[in-house]
Amino acid sequence: MKDVLYRLFEHQYLGRDEARTILQNIAAGKYNDSQIASLITVYLMRNISVEELTGFREALLEMRVPVDLSEFKPIDIVGTGGDGKNTFNISTASCFVVAGAGYNVVKHGNYGATSVSGASNVMEQHGVKFTTDIDRLRRSMEACHIAYLHAPLFNPALKAVAPIRKSLGVRSFFNMLGPLVNPVMPAYQLLGVYNLPSVSYTHLRAHETLMNLV
């Protein structure tokens, strides 16, 4: 990791495969907290490249706990967070509205890293019990038109970095990654981002979805 950090500090970029390996190593506990915090800090000082984001995303998808809810044809309504405005959780509130209208929603989220109102914070306050049990998720979808996937239960890397992200308290590239790695891989997604330049990265999700449907 030391060599990788030196290269990044010199404004070099990671290749797709290298980025994938780094996320796999984070999940395996091969880096200490300071090294992971340094990696996060790099991407606060420059934009992440599409190749880097793609590699990170591929690693998370490869390590995820897969969930098949395709029979419900659900939509994912999600935001990156990190806009610094300390608003209420808009995407989660939107999920309640859409599910209440009878449309199936599969929400993938986490505790807030830069706020107190992450999706998991909101769901927990409403009495939702986080689970990976597919039967419970299906029953939730059938009864309420919504199923909630707490990200750390479905991906070891996201669990590994959660305390570091919370300690830093600043927006990171994981804000971009979270919405791109819903374990259900829903064909439909409404995605909110923290600033206009981030919109370009949503094309990654759109492209991958189209490729999966071909």
Predicted regions and their residues:
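Acidic, glycine/proline-rich low-complexity segments that act as flexible tails and inter-domain linkers
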Residues: M1-T87, A101
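Phosphate/diphosphate-binding glycine-rich loops and adjacent basic-rich segments that engage nucleotide
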Residues: R136-G192
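Conserved small/polar residues in nucleotide/adenosyl-binding loops
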Residues: T202-T209
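Residue-level signal for inorganic ion chemistry
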Residues: L39, M123, G178
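A glycine-rich helix N-cap at a beta->alpha junction
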Residues: Q125-S140
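Conserved active-site and cofactor/substrate-binding residues in soluble primary-metabolism enzymes
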Residues: Y13-T21, K30-Q35, I48-G55, N89, ...
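Active-site-proximal loop->helix
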Residues: G112-V128
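Glycine/serine-rich anion-binding loops at beta->alpha junctions
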Residues: P74-V116, N175-M176, V181
